[in-house]
Amino acid sequence: MKQVLLSFLLLCSSISIASAQNKRYVFFLHNMYLEQAGLNGEHPEYGRVEYKEVISAFEKEGFTVISEVRKNGTDAVEYAKKVKRQADSLIATGVRASYITVVGTSKVAFIAWHVAGMMGKKNMNFVLIGICNESTIADNKNVQPSGNILSIYEKTDVIGQSCLAVKNSSTGEINHFREIELNTGQKHGFLYKASPLWLGPAIKWAKGNYE
């Protein structure tokens, strides 16, 4: 009886591990405003950050989402190390790097940028939204990202623009790179909303559609 029970438990454990290995994972890193103002904060121009709605959108597509509202004043590099450890743990259990995506919005997207540099995984996915400008590129010039990188920015946004310079200067292994320019007229506020205009491409990227 004990042997049968042990065999059953081992089978259940194997099924559980196999199930976890076949799931796709998204690390979602919200913007700085939410870190400072909290879930109920209302930006005077852009309104509320639709954090829960973004999480829900990824979950509805079958992703396991790993995310939290960070404490105000969180050290970005240390947080990137935390995300790296979590991603390493998933890979150690047998999850393919290509099934893991790190999505970062606004200036906090450079946490994702740092993770891309720390991981050195050419098959891991990264989505950088509204981050790149002369200042952020200069401040993070020593970070050499690898992986499949999707950059999304808004034409009317003065904070985040093209990340092409990052791709061109990186000595890391960038397997796939794509950039999308939106033109919503919402300036930096476009990334406060759970908009299909950026969520749609991000979801496709996280599913391995790099076209």
Listing of model-derived features with the role each one plays in the protein:
Residues 125-188:
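The feature captures the conserved acid-bearing segment of alpha/beta-hydrolase catalytic domains
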Residues 4-13:
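Sec-dependent N-terminal signal peptides
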Residues 55-73:
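Conserved alpha/beta-hydrolase
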Residues 103-112:
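Gly/Ala-rich beta-loop-alpha elbow adjacent to hydrolase catalytic centers
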Residues 177-211:
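C-terminal catalytic histidine-bearing segment of alpha/beta-hydrolase fold enzymes
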Residues 18-20:
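Boundary at the C-terminal end of the N-terminal hydrophobic targeting segment
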